[in-house]
Amino acid sequence: MRRSFVCVLALLLLTALTCFSQQTDIRQFTVFGAFSYLSTPSLNLTQRGFDGDLGYNARPWLTFGFDFSYNNGHSSVLPNYLNSATQAKLAPILPILQELGIPPAIPYNSSTYTYEGGPQFNYRRMQHVTLFARPALGLLHGVFSAKPNNPVIAELVNGLLNGSTSKSDNVVFYGFGGGITWEITPKFGLRVATDFVHYNYFSNLLSGGRNSVRVVVGTKFNFGKNIVGKK
């Protein structure tokens, strides 16, 4: 994934070096759809999915948009990921797991939905390339589904989640992002973007907040009237 991202970014940057005239055709609306890669290192969690957004170009340099993404992946919860209260509950059980030769890890599946809206600031001094930056602020909906791999872990999950194997949470995330678009034509382009965000979900189980990095690669379609001339 990283190699593909670097190759696409290098292609866009090389294109930028040959395109230094200002854009003269900027459509009023944009629709973007992309493959999404979401990494949360503190949980050793990698998720993949899709991202889509709608944008309104109020000015060549200013876009207002709404973004939605869905990502899914799996990993395992380890004791050091948990907050002190939850670790205290586990303390009497860990020696028993060790005697039985059972690793103290809970496999799980995770789904992450994000909803985001706000401004984007564009640099359009190159004819076929747009650089942009934006604040990241929105709502994150996380769904955790435990996948116990033996009866002992299943009982442990039931105890921690009050008889359930799944849990969900809604939290606010914040951060920043940016990227580059290769404007192949006034109505079609390729975009690479990345966002860095911070949030604190499942705080009654997990310790501290989380940082995640999202990378998206996809196509952008532009339509509506040409807004060049607005300042």
What are these regions (language model features)?
Residues S21-A58, F64, Y70, R214-K231:
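Short glycine/proline- and aromatic-enriched beta-strand/turn motifs that initiate or cap beta-hairpins
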Residues Y37-P41, G101-P107, N158-S166, Y201-S207:
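Extracellular loop and loop/strand-boundary signature of outer-membrane beta-barrel proteins
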Residues G33-F35, G52-Y56, G117-F121, P135-L139, ...:
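Residues on the lipid-exposed face of transmembrane beta-strands in outer-membrane beta-barrel proteins
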Residues W61-F66, Q127-V129, W182, P186-L190, ...:
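Repeated loop/turn-to-beta-strand initiation elements of outer-membrane beta-barrel proteins
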